[in-house]
A protein has these predicted regions:
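Conserved pre-motif I regulatory segment
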Residues: 1-30
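Walker A/P-loop
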Residues: 25-45
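Short glycine-rich anion-binding loops that position phosphate/pyrophosphate groups of nucleotides
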Residues: 34, 113-115, 138-139
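Short conserved AdoMet
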Residues: 22, 50, 102, 157-158, ...
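Conserved nucleic-acid-binding Ia/Ib motif block in the N-terminal RecA-like helicase ATPase lobe
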Residues: 4-7, 53-120, 128-131, 174-178, ...
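Short hydrophobic/aromatic beta-strand immediately N-terminal to the Walker A/P-loop
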Residues: 28-30, 58, 163
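Conserved phosphate-coupling serine/threonine residues in phosphotransfer and NTP-handling enzymes
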Residues: 11, 33-35, 62-63, 111, ...
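Interdomain coupling/hinge region of P-loop NTPase helicase/AAA+ cores
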Residues: 77, 86-88, 97, 125-210
Length: 210
């Protein structure tokens, strides 16, 4: 799928992270937005999964928009693998999502709240999940999401690998990650500058009555 789309050279984060993840190691990957982080964790997850119809990997995202985006890219990356990649996120019909899950799923992409809801309702079994990934991990491990992430993690006794990817990793986030990572390999891209387009700035003076 990758070569057919014209991909010939991996980005730095892909070049550094994919071989390590393929070996089954836990990975903390840091690179700027737009550097190919999704493929960096998505390719090893796809390669490790089989079209069994049972959840083997789960990727958590902070927003439903990102969950949809990640799922679409994974679907593109898998090519003819035949994997079922499903999304679960809030703000949509939960019964419809439950029916979709019943048809079978190999890789799940979702938001923490809806994943927990689906699990507690019996629609999503996390016990056989072997690969666990946090996208935008800096947001996923802040104080707002951390309890939910930890709850989900505790439902995965079969977990073999944890992948964390983000553009930034404050020290408190790295400390939180120690709760559920096993001797992770840190992959930090050298190209972390934020690309900011040129912006025309101007000022408008208004009278005191306004």
């Amino acid at each position: 799928a990758i070569s057919s789309k014209g991909w010939t050279t991996p980005t730095e984060i892909q070049f550094e992270a994919i071989p390590v993840a393929r070996k089954g190691r836990d990975v903390v990957g840091q690179a700027r937005t737009g550097s190919g982080k999704t493929a960096a964790f998505g390719i090893p997850i796809i390669e490790a999964a089989s079209a069994s119809g049972k959840p083997q990997a789960i990727i958590l995202c902070p927003t439903r928009e990102l969950a949809v985006q990640v799922a679409e890219e994974l679907t593109w990356l898998q090519g003819e693998s035949g994997l079922s990649i499903q999304t679960v996120y809030g703000g949509t019909d939960i019964d419809k999502q439950a029916r979709e899950l019943q048809s079978g799923s190999d890789i799940m992409v979702g938001t923490p709240g809806r994943v927990i809801d689906m699990s507690k309702r019996g629609h999503l079994n996390l016990s056989d999940i072997s690969h666990f990934c946090l996208d935008e991990a800096d947001r996923m491990l802040d104080m707002g999401f951390f309890p939910d992430v930890l709850w989900i993690f505790e439902q995965m006794p079969a977990r073999e690998q944890t992948l964390l990817f983000s553009a930034t990793f404050p020290q408190e986030v790295l400390d939180a990650a120690e709760e559920f990572m096993n001797a992770p390999v840190y992959v930090m891209s050298d190209d972390l500058e934020v690309e900011v387009p040129e912006i025309d700035q101007f000022a408008v003076r208004i009278g005191p009555s306004n």
